[in-house]
């Protein structure tokens, strides 16, 4: 972390050079902070009844913020940082392939392509073509076609008389073939 004169993260560290580096307004307010804190603390119900333990607890709570622990940047920090950076990059390069694969798969679960199902519907040809077969269009040059299917002479609405009753040979027992 670079500490320039104007950087906000340097504000804690400025007092290492004595009160010279602090501005007048900051110095004036610094004396007042204890009063303000005491005013605030009066409103709060303490966790422990006895004051020593309460103060100890407050002090320990405040220590948890990372900046107050280390006032000055330590000498070894640069080498430490370099080492940490190297190890981090090594870990990233090792795990990158699996990470990319997981990231690609995560938005949607695996969707198979739609399966195309063919149903072969059996239609007698005279039904398929209509009664007169393929009708020719007169607007175009007529190609020599084979003669169309002869129209079916007659179709029984019910089962034709000479066939016996099928043993469930048609589609279903309850749906007679018409």
From Swiss-Prot:
InterPro entries: Tra
Chief subcellular location: nucleus
Biased composition (Basic and acidic residues): 1-18, 25-40
GO molecular function list: pre-mRNA binding
Pfam families, A to Z: Transformer (PF06495)
Keyword presence, Ribosomal protein: no
Ranges of Basic residues composition bias in the record: 59-73, 81-108
Domain remarks in the Swiss-Prot or TrEMBL record: RS domain directs localization of proteins to the speckled subnuclear compartment and the purpose of this localization is to allow colocalization and co-concentration of components of the splicing and splicing regulatory machinery to permit relatively high rates and/or efficiencies of reaction and interaction.
Main function: Member of the regulatory pathway controlling female somatic sexual differentiation, regulated by Sxl. Activates dsx female-specific splicing by promoting the formation of a splicing enhancer complex which consists of tra, tra2 and sr proteins.
Additional facts recorded: The sexual regulation of tra occurs through a mechanism of sex-specific alternative RNA splicing. The non-sex-specific RNA expressed in males is not translated.
Name of the protein described by the UniProt record: Female-specific protein transformer
